[in-house]
């Protein structure tokens, strides 16, 4: 299965598209830092130190985009990740926060296949400096962002109240007050209660 097939399956299961509005900037604003933003009504932002991964290298290999890649596994914030990296591109980076292998990560997935990243092409055509898309952000930490995204799937009124300070009111067709029901399951990359 490729990333698109896995994503389509997850959408059928009712899992949200969290992460589609996530931006991860490594070594930004300073070396050794990671900045993460998530666009939900307004932009949430947190900065933290770059994670240090303890990768276990295996003997498994495959070919991705014409590059011979080798497998490695690690655990980070409640998830076990499997990655394939290529030493032919000696850049110790990868998708999302994943990094620290002796080559570029061209494929990564968590053990439940809820999150999957697969290289589909490469270009060396960078014309714009790396920067935040918006300067107006609500600062938080990683756990607070995860809690807000989880709340978004459970209690929309409370989510909007915490975000805006205003209690939304909802009415049915006859004018009677009603409550919005969240109708999806939050699927977060980072788990803090495990």
Predicted features by range, described:
Residues 1-194:
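Extended soluble regions of mature proteins
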